[in-house]
Amino acid sequence: MSRAGTWLKMLGAGIVICVGGPAFVQSIRPTDEELFKRYNPELQRRSLEEGDRRAQEFDDYVNRLKQWSKSDKSIWYAAQEQQEQKRSEAEALRNQAKDEARAQREEMRKELLGGK
């Protein structure tokens, strides 16, 4: 009987730990509203202002991950390719802006030289 009693005690203790532990954690964890109320007013205001922007950024990121996962390549390679593509586009825009500025300077020079 002592072995059966020991097993029953251990089974009971296991059930209390496996069920009671998560239930206890759930009961003491504050809700999002309680956490928000603990913020100071400036943080509350900033959180409200930036909440939509952050949610949109997260949605964009999740959509990019979904797009990358459709590729046959690894997500990391797809992300790297997209970064390289953005970098090359930014470089092309920079070069275009430089060319436009150079053309504008040349026009200004011609106007100044032609006006003298």
Swiss-Prot record:
This is Assembly factor cbp4. Its main location: mitochondrion. The keyword Transferase does not apply. Residues 86-116 are annotated as: Disordered. Pfam families: CBP4. Residues 77-112 form a coiled coil. The chain crosses the membrane at residues 7-25.
